[in-house]
Amino acid sequence: MKLVTAIIKPFKLDEVREALSGIGVQGITVTEVKGFGRQKGHTELYRGAEYVVDFLPKVKIEAAVADELVDRVIEAIESGARTGKIGDGKIFVYDLQQVVRIRTGETGAEAL
């Protein structure tokens, strides 16, 4: 089992969600986050004063999936999130030691 985490542009969330649903991902967790990488920040004008916005709004998507689904999940996220411009995001894949469905007590792949 793996936890696939992606940091993407907020306006690409619907496309990514649809792509993941299309390959059978049954649930995701979405968190609004801020960060910067190569994209860096930008300068804004507020009440006549310029200031630098260092952290840009992003969306973090997390999906716990079976090992055999990981490559398809990565492809779905890439296709849904890609604009071809700096700041499209990153995908991280982590091993999951254990998963437990609290309601039923199911564990492992059955809990996904």
Model-predicted regions and their roles:
Residues 1-112:
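Positively charged, small/polar-rich N-terminal and surface patches that mediate targeting and assembly
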